[in-house]
Amino acid sequence: MFLNSLDLPGQPENSRIVVAMSGGVDSSVVAGLLKKEGYDVIGITLQLYDHGAATHRVGACCAGQDIEDARCVAETLGIPHYVLDYEERFREAVIDPFAASYAHGETPVPCIACNQTVKFADLLATARELDADALATGHYIRSRSHGAHRALFRPLDSDRDQSYFLFATTQEQIDYLRFPLGDLPKARVREMATEMGFVVANKHDSQDICFVPQGKYSDIITKLRPEAVNPGVIVHVDGQVLGKHSGIVHYTVGQRRGIGVATGEALYVVYLDVENARVIVGPREMLETHKLFLRDVNWLGDERLDNFPPDGIEMAVKVRSTRPPHLARLHYQEGVFSVDFLECENSVAPGQACVFYDGNSDGARVLGGGFVTHSERAAETEMMLKRVLCNLETTSAVASEFKTKVSYT
């Protein structure tokens, strides 16, 4: 059977492809490439939010000027283009959970939630309703045939690798999705945009958290979850109250800058005691993480979960999109996934994603991932954290005395 460039049967003109057009360079080039090859291309842009200043902010996406840019590109290509209002859905599926997660002391990754719900569930369903054979996006990731299905692989351009944000894609979605930029470097994509005459050829790349004006995520969280800005105290792991804070929303595990205390010692946020509004700080070595426990795991590997090896599977994992994969061993016992690092990781916060790969090479296959619920650190660190957390009554008394001496700003 003849397969076209998207691994679909038949000639390109016999395949209808919906392209998710954000108004940026990447998705515009995808639409241009597919149109040039002869596919029946339909562009769809999702209006996800309209938050005043964010609408025209450099680096924003899916609002205001971006919609106009997508429309202009579609006109240049001569393809149909539709704008769908998904603001309410985006708020419910992405923004509200993002704020709730931060209020619980987690470090969420909203782009993953957006891909899970709005883009690869709702938009994909719309593409099927339009009788499209595939949904194509401008993500930098590769997909190709793997047995009876398709699998995800890290892209050619490792600097643009977006596999971390796509681990939650289900097998059914992977089979329907196409990623034409997976084998192209970003520099070449920009050249193509210029060659195609797109007005977006020199447009800035969108930021990770697209709905946050000027990167001030605390403003949105303060509005949606005011309890996250309750004042509290900053406590050293030795139990000493060092200072005050104006809300745990301003802190994340591993943070060093902007903690708000000066002791002459290099201090990092090592734990957030959300219930008691306490920020626990300590030396960097207390951030060394040996084991993770995960929730909401999407497993894309070949091994059946009911036949998972008792001693686990060695693989590479990423706990941040900007970090390289590190070797670890994945375990699955009694419905619980856990990860043992072969070399300790640093600054792993609840809510972060942990993504699995079959190796640490540039073209490694994505095996899924999950979200961190909690971690285990060195035995001494665990003991010190338990001690300061159990010493709540004493710490609270000291904190009350401290508050009488210092006024909150």
Swiss-Prot record:
Residues 160-162 are annotated as: Interaction with tRNA. GO terms for biological process: tRNA wobble position uridine thiolation. The record marks 139, 352 as: Interaction with tRNA. Disulfide bonds join 114-210. Keywords: ATP-binding, Cytoplasm, Disulfide bond, Nucleotide-binding, RNA-binding, Transferase, tRNA processing, tRNA-binding. One of its GO terms (molecular function) is tRNA binding. Its EC number is 2.8.1.13. It catalyses: S-sulfanyl-L-cysteinyl-[protein] + uridine(34) in tRNA + AH2 + ATP = 2-thiouridine(34) in tRNA + L-cysteinyl-[protein] + A + AMP + diphosphate + H(+). ATP binds at residues 20-27, 46, 138. InterPro entries: MnmA-like, MnmA-like_C, MnmA-like_central, MnmA-like_central_sf, Rossmann-like_a/b/a_fold. The active site is at residues 114, 210. GO terms for cellular component: cytoplasm. It is an enzyme of class 2 (transferase). HAMAP family: tRNA_thiouridyl_MnmA. Belongs to the MnmA/TRMU family. Catalyzes the 2-thiolation of uridine at the wobble position (U34) of tRNA, leading to the formation of s(2)U34. This is tRNA-specific 2-thiouridylase MnmA.
